[in-house]
């Protein structure tokens, strides 16, 4: 989409923070209105994360207006809310390409812009990185400032509190901005807090506060009285006690949609020493009523008509694998009162909405706390229940020690339903499910299953749920199932694959949902096709049978080749001294960028044509 200067006359003057800082303050509310409309126009045409960015327009403008970015370093947590930041930092005309192959990255990305200080995608990393950056800036000695912006969801994670605890100890000069869009702010309380925030962040108050502490530092009763008086003044209107106890100077909450008020407060706080904490209240989806009413639905959107206020309805085609999981979960819970389901803030994405409504006493959303989710499941298992952890592949990485130490070593029957395994598409490097087979395969006592279709997925979930000798995992992809018939549930024999097609010379050992493409290749090359089903334990007898009756083996998986299922096949053959040529097909040794799943599979040679070409080139 070409930029319409007539439609956005103020935004047309701003293609960088330097140009932003040339504008008079009085024009900034108009700039915010235009920026919000441009974001709506752009994302509705291209798709992308939507509601979060609408809520951070004023904050983004205020931060770049007050701070000398990129010299001063601005760090965004997660990055869903950073679209306005991208628009104001030289990427305005490319915002329509965001999340597309070869387009702007969906999150702040160091390789894309000098204004993107930290590459992000996973939550709760900003404060830890910000402390390191602030310490480095202090040693540099050039008065470079550090600001971290974190949301009310991300700040609930343990890593954020670990970082704040450390900041309170070493006291770097930095600002943490909490973008809180969970609660509404009433006009009266908001006005009082805005006034108080500007007072408490001002130089006079700060000087009196620090000077008073120095004067009375040797008089404990008076020092304690001053501290309590300050706390009572703040406590009348602010909920910042926790952050003060962690060692931060807390200001807020303030109206995050008052751009001029934010600028005043940020200017006052800019030169304060030590860790500062600014709590702002915003509304997710601000300025677009449908998104304000339903920010979860409008969190990430496909292309849509903004005048309709509705997102396009699903075509009613095949169910997603997440839906297959959710249906199985409800079906099983209705029969077994011991079932408990856990998710780290992924209710909608993991297909658990219906379960949460039907079985609220057995549904646990632990927020963005993957480590806690896994060890909580371990505790439930110890207590005699049957926990299921529904989690994205990329987020399970954050709880690796808990899987190993708290579940596997104790042989606890926890079932991991691993969604978004393999290539996920538009969210790029930080969200691809490329590594779960590699990092789980080396854990003793773990059973790992890779369904080739939705019926296999149900059978494997059932098998894992009834496996009581240790943990199990079923990994399945983002996207729709393939349309096979669903058969009655029954336990699969652990560690056994099945031959789907008999051929000659070549045997293709497939792990997972690339099976339809693998079947095309097998047909074209007249190869034997095996659905291996289990990555751990591997069907060693079947592998050795295939090695004995074929000239070469091909392994196929949508996981990193290094350490993946194919590596396991290689290990079996070497352990039995079978010098059979093996070609491992899977994800290469680099972080997979954004693009649709179809685009990336084609580029990586994981569609039928690409696999066949790789095999023919290898055999030549």
From Swiss-Prot:
This is 1-deoxy-D-xylulose-5-phosphate synthase. Pathway: Metabolic intermediate biosynthesis; 1-deoxy-D-xylulose 5-phosphate biosynthesis; 1-deoxy-D-xylulose 5-phosphate from D-glyceraldehyde 3-phosphate and pyruvate: step 1/1. It comes from the Bacteria. One of its GO terms (molecular function) is 1-deoxy-D-xylulose-5-phosphate synthase activity. Thiamine diphosphate binds at residues 80, 121-123, 153-154, 181, 288, 370. InterPro entries: Dxylulose-5-P_synthase (IPR005477), THDP-binding (IPR029061), Transketo_C/PFOR_II (IPR009014), Transketolase-like_Pyr-bd (IPR005475), Transketolase_BS (IPR020826), Transketolase_C (IPR033248), Transketolase_CS (IPR049557). Its EC number is 2.2.1.7. The keyword Glycosyltransferase does not apply. Homodimer. Catalyzes the acyloin condensation reaction between C atoms 2 and 3 of pyruvate and glyceraldehyde 3-phosphate to yield 1-deoxy-D-xylulose-5-phosphate (DXP). The gene is dxs.
